[in-house]
Swiss-Prot record:
The keyword Glycosyltransferase applies. Keywords: Glycosyltransferase, Transferase. InterPro entries: UDP-glycosyltransf_plant, UDP_glucos_trans, UDP_glycos_trans_CS. The gene is UGT71C2. Possesses low quercetin 3-O-glucosyltransferase, 7-O-glucosyltransferase and 3'-O-glucosyltransferase activities in vitro. Glucosylates other secondary metabolites in vitro like vanillin, trans-resveratrol, curumin and etoposide. Belongs to the UDP-glycosyltransferase family. One of its GO terms (molecular function) is quercetin 7-O-glucosyltransferase activity. Disulfide bonds: none annotated. This is UDP-glycosyltransferase 71C2. UDP-alpha-D-glucose binds at residues 293, 352-354, 369-377, 391-394.
C-alpha cells in the first residue's frame, strides 16, 4: 500500500483569546493524534483595529513556542476597514465586512504558501479550517481548490440555531422580535421549544440579523464542521446532525477542548496568590465569580455583587475585569470598607487562572457568564454553575445547560448586559445560596458528565474517533 501523503492545514481563527486558545489546542490535538499524517498546521493571524495586536501576537507565539509543527503567519492590516460606527451599531455586521476585506490578504498568503510547493513535495495543503466568523474566506479556498472546514468554538446547540436561521431565511422573514416574551421557536437539535429572548441579541436588529443569516448560509458550503463539544453532553443535537439533514456537512464532535492559559502576559505572582489562598479553604466551600475576558461590568453592578456577597457570608473568589473608562482597579469601585468586612472570607482579583481554579478542590460553585469555554471547563471538573449570561450566544448557552441538559442552576437566562439592567443584590445572593447549599444542584449528573468528557477524548472515545474520521477524510 502506498504511503499516505502528509497534510498541512491552514487555520484562520477569530482573534480573541477564547477562539485563539481553542484553535491552538485543536491544532495540538490533531498533530498528536496522527503525527505521521498531520505534518504542519499554519495559523494565519489577523487582528481588528481596536484589539492590541502586539500583546496578542506575543501571546500566540508563547503558546506555540514548543510546537515545531505549528507555525504562525501574521497578515497585514486591512486597509480602509469598516467604520467603527458600524461596530457600535451591529458588531456582527462589522466583523463580517472586515473579514471580506481580508480576502486579498488571505489570497496572497495562500498563493505564497502554495507556490513554494512542487508536485514531488511529500506534504500537501489539505484545506482551510475557518472560525465561523471567517466563512467569507471559503471563497478564497475555492479559488485554490482547497476544501474549507469550519471550527465551531461554540456548542452543537449553537449549530442548531444556525441551521434554524438558514431555514427561517428561506421564508424571507425579517429580524426576530425580542419584545414578545411568550414566543418560542423550534430549533433543530433541541428537545424543548426555545424562547426567542435567549437568542443572540444581534438577531433583533436588522444589520446584525442579516450578518448572522449570511454566515448561516455559508455553513453548508463547508466540507465539514468541527464542534467543541462531545456526544454525551449534547446527544440530541449531534443525533440530529448525524442524519445529515438537507445534505448538511458532516459534523465532528471533537471536544471538550480545554484552554489552560487564557491570558497574554501571564501574571505568575497573582496566580500563586490566588492558588495559595484556595489551598487554605475547606473543600467545596468557595463560590467563584468570573464573567469572561472581553467585557467589564458596570460600576453599579459591581456594588450589587459586593452587597450580595456580604449578605450570604459564603467564602468567595471574585475576578473583576477592570474598565479603564470607569475604574482602573477593583479597589476603586468596591463599596467603602468592603475588603475589611470580608477579610478572611473572600478574595478579589483582576485576572484569574480559570481552569486551575475550577480544578481546585476548594471550589464548590461557579457564577458564570456562560461563555462556552467556561461551561466546558466547569463541566470538566464537575463544578455547578449559576447562569448569568451577558452577550453574544451566552443566553442560548445558559438555556441549553439549564433547560435542555439539566446541568446548571438558573439565575438568569435572558440577561443582556448592553440593555443596562442592574441585577439586584437580593437576587444574586439567593442564587449564590442555592448554588452552594441548594438541593436542586445536579451534582451526581455533573460528576457523570465530567467522567464522560474525560472518556470522550481518550483512545476509542467518541471525540477521539471523530478526530480520526476528520483526519482520514483529508
Amino acid at each position: 500500500m502506498a504511503k499516505q501523503q502528509e497534510a498541512e492545514l491552514i487555520f484562520i481563527p477569530f482573534p480573541i483569546p477564547g477562539h485563539i486558545l481553542a484553535t491552538i489546542e485543536l491544532a495540538k490535538r490533531l498533530i498528536s493524534h496522527q503525527p505521521s499524517r498531520i505534518h504542519t498546521i499554519t495559523i494565519l493571524h489577523w487582528s481588528l483595529p481596536f484589539l492590541p495586536q502586539s500583546d496578542t501576537i506575543a501571546f500566540l507565539k508563547s503558546l506555540i513556542e514548543t510546537e515545531s509543527r505549528i507555525r504562525l503567519i501574521t497578515l497585514p492590516d486591512v486597509q480602509n476597514p469598516p467604520p467603527m460606527e458600524l461596530f457600535v451599531k451591529a458588531s456582527e455586521s462589522y466583523i463580517l465586512e472586515y473579514v471580506k476585506k481580508m480576502v486579498p490578504l488571505v489570497r496572497n498568503a495562500l498563493s505564497t504558501l502554495l507556490s513554494s510547493r512542487d508536485e514531488s513535495d511529500s506534504v500537501h495543503v489539505a484545506g482551510l479550517v475557518l472560525d465561523f466568523f471567517c466563512v467569507p474566506l471559503i471563497d478564497v479556498g475555492n479559488e485554490f481548490n482547497l476544501p474549507s472546514y469550519i471550527f465551531l468554538t461554540c456548542s452543537a446547540s449553537f449549530l442548531g440555531m444556525m441551521k434554524y436561521l438558514l431555514e427561517r431565511n428561506r421564508e424571507t422573514k425579517p429580524e426576530l422580535n425580542r419584545s414578545s416574551d411568550e414566543e418560542t421557536i423550534s430549533v433543530p437539535g433541541f428537545v424543548n421549544s426555545v424562547p426567542v429572548k435567549v437568542l443572540p441579541p444581534g438577531l433583533f436588529t436588522t444589520e446584525s440579523y442579516e450578518a448572522w443569516v449570511e454566515m448561516a448560509e455559508r455553513f453548508p458550503e463547508a466540507k465539514g464542521i468541527l464542534v467543541n463539544s462531545f456526544e454525551s453532553l449534547e446527544r440530541n443535537a449531534f443525533d440530529y446532525f448525524d442524519r445529515r439533514p438537507d445534505n448538511y456537512p458532516p459534523v465532528y464532535p471533537i471536544g471538550p477542548i480545554l484552554c489552560s492559559n487564557d491570558r497574554p502576559n501571564l501574571d505568575l505572582s497573582e496566580r500563586d496568590r490566588i492558588l495559595k489562598w484556595l489551598d487554605d479553604q475547606p473543600e467545596s466551600s468557595v463560590v467563584f465569580l468570573c464573567f469572561g475576558s472581553l467585557k467589564s461590568l458596570a460600576a453599579s453592578q459591581i456594588k450589587e455583587i459586593a452587597q450580595a456577597l456580604e449578605l450570604v457570608g459564603i467564602r468567595f473568589l471574585w475576578s473583576i475585569r477592570t474598565d479603564p473608562k470607569e475604574y482602573a482597579s477593583p479597589n476603586e469601585i468596591l463599596p467603602d470598607g468592603f475588603m475589611n468586612r470580608v477579610m478572611g472570607l473572600g478574595l478579589v482579583c483582576g485576572w484569574a487562572p480559570q481552569v486551575e481554579i475550577l480544578a481546585h478542590k476548594a471550589i464548590g460553585g461557579f457564577v458564570s457568564h456562560c461563555g462556552w469555554n467556561s461551561i466546558l471547563e466547569s463541566l470538566r471538573f464537575g463544578v455547578p454553575i449559576a447562569t448569568w449570561p451577558m452577550y453574544a450566544e451566552q443566553q442560548l448557552n445558559a438555556f441549553t445547560i439549564v433547560k435542555e441538559l439539566g446541568l446548571a442552576l438558573e439565575m438568569r437566562l435572558d440577561y443582556v448586559s448592553e440593555y443596562g439592567e442592574i441585577v439586584k443584590a437580593d437576587e444574586i445572593a439567593g442564587a449564590v445560596r442555592s448554588l452552594m447549599d441548594g438541593e436542586d444542584v445536579p451534582r451526581r449528573k455533573l460528576k457523570e458528565i465530567a467522567e464522560a468528557g474525560k472518556e470522550a477524548v481518550m483512545d476509542g472515545g467518541s471525540s477521539f474517533v471523530a478526530v480520526k474520521r476528520f483526519i482520514d477524510g483529508l
